[in-house]
Amino acid sequence: MPTPPVQPSRPIPPNPTPIYRIVHIDNLSTILARGNIHAPNHVPADGRAWTGIHDVTTQAARGQLPVPCGPRGVILDYVGFYFGPRSPMLYRIHTGHNVARVDQSNIAYLVSTVQAVAGAGLGFVFYDRHSLARVAACYDNLARLNEVDFQTCNATQWNTTPQFPDRQEKKQAEFLVHRAMPWSLVGQVGVVNAAAAARVNEILAGSVHRPSVSVEGSWYY
């Protein structure tokens, strides 16, 4: 019987495992007032201002997609994070491709870790690629983090090619926090330049919890 080919081993996931969410800087005041980043289906009816940067069509699909593990529900019951920066969604926002164009100086990254979420006892799931991808696999056990292609999640090139037909899907692997993500679990805010950092620091000046604010130009286009 022929020996099966040796499959390449998956890289060991980073520990701690960073997760990244992009938001409009104008929304930081609302997040601070609420003390949480809320999932779309669980936003308080408090009338506070919110500037959306999402794709309406994609958001509608996420509202219909059942989550097959963990706390269940649908994708919009969760706060979404990526496992790496420089997402295809940020590129679309930067270029205005089928979404409202927003200058990247107005976009901040909220950075936490998988371990912080799990340690706080929050419900979560994660996908090995974009959750809307036909073959996306859902997990709720951190022992399965090696199913995520972290090399692709952190790659600067993510376009689909004949050699890498699912690279764009894998770049968008998601970590989803059920219902709400406490502001206290955000450990870093990344921005594109010093002016944006000054703006964020001004907003955070009155916050009890003040994550570090850093200029991360390589996270942007």
Question: What is each PLM-predicted segment?
Answer:
Residues 1-82, 87-221:
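Active-site-proximal loop/hinge segments that shape catalytic or ion-binding/gating pockets
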